[in-house]
Curated annotation (Swiss-Prot):
Keywords: Adaptive immunity, Disulfide bond, Glycoprotein, Immunity, Membrane, MHC II, Signal, Transmembrane, Transmembrane helix. InterPro entries: Ig-like_dom, Ig-like_dom_sf, Ig-like_fold, Ig/MHC_CS, Ig_C1-set, MHC/Immunoglobulin, MHC_I/II-like_Ag-recog, MHC_II_a/b_N. It is found in: Membrane. Residues 25-109 are annotated as: Alpha-1. Belongs to the MHC class II family. Residues 25-216 are extracellular. Its main location: membrane. It comes from Mus musculus (Mouse). Residues 204-216 are annotated as: Connecting peptide. This is H-2 class II histocompatibility antigen, I-E alpha chain. Residues 110-203 are annotated as: Alpha-2. Residues 112-204 form the Ig-like C1-type domain.
Length: 254
């Protein structure tokens, strides 16, 4: 299967160096927006907008709507998704022309890397969020699925669009809101063209092993012993202090 990728990228900066390269550009803030389209069965492509490396929104190709990273952003401004959809369509058209008019070498499929971790320290019974971070994605076509006790989970799942790395690969984050329980185990399932088979990244809460009755007894005994020693030592110091004070106040011979 031959696949090709074309990226359309425009970067806006507050201060630009006209003659320097990317590493020579100095800017207070950088806004990045662009499209990514690639040859593949079905309608695949995306339009994203980032500011200082953080995604603000993307255009959902299936739902044909603007998806804000934080709902509050959508209350401050707006973006017509038709603009992003039009740019995606233009990019696909240009891609087909490039493929027909040139001899291209299909890009190699890279094997993505996944990591799963909780957003906050885990406490049983307290709501939390699991994050599946998938990096080194190329081409940007991937399926990320959450499993709880080996069963698919769809409620409480949210994922970002494909975010561009400096080496032109992509990364994506998938979130799962959950309530930690010592009865549940979770897996992040990753499917990609660069993998011979799906990869499962396992996670389960690390619950400290309960202390045995003997251990609890020993700990309590040690604590009591330390407390008694402290009382005895403190009493000795107090007595010595009183004696020293009495001696210093005793009148000497005339």
């Amino acid at each position: 299967r031959s696949r090709a990728l074309i990226l359309g990228v425009l970067a806006l900066t507050t201060m630009l160096s006209l003659c320097g390269g990317e590493d020579d550009i100095e800017a207070d803030h950088v806004a990045f927006y662009g499209i990514s389209v690639y040859q593949s069965p079905g309608d695949i492509g995306q339009y994203t907008f980032e500011f200082d490396g953080d995604e603000l929104f993307y255009v959902d190709l299936d739902k044909k709507e603007t998806v804000w990273m934080l709902p509050e952003f959508g209350q401050l401004t707006s973006f017509d998704p038709q603009g992003g959809l039009q740019e995606i369509a233009t990019g696909k058209y240009n891609l087909e022309i490039l493929i027909k008019d040139s001899n291209f070498t299909p890009a190699a499929n890279e094997a993505p890397q996944a990591t799963v971790f909780p957003k906050s320290p885990v406490l049983l019974g307290q709501p939390n969020t699991l994050i599946c971070f998938v990096d080194n994605i190329f081409p940007p076509v991937i399926n990320i699925t959450w499993l709880r006790n080996s069963k698919s989970v769809t409620d409480g799942v949210y994922e970002t669009s494909f975010l561009v790395n400096r080496d032109h690969s992509f990364h994506k984050l998938s979130y799962l809101t959950f309530i930690p329980s010592d009865d549940d185990i979770y897996d992040c399932k990753v499917e990609h063209w660069g993998l011979e088979e799906p990869v499962l990244k396992h996670w389960e809460p690390e619950i400290p092993a309960p202390m045995s009755e003997l251990t609890e007894t020993v700990v309590c005994a040690l604590g009591l012993s330390v407390g008694l020693v402290g009382i005895v030592v403190g009493t000795i110091f107090i007595i010595q202090g009183l004696r020293s004070g009495g001696t210093s106040r005793h009148p000497g011979p005339l």
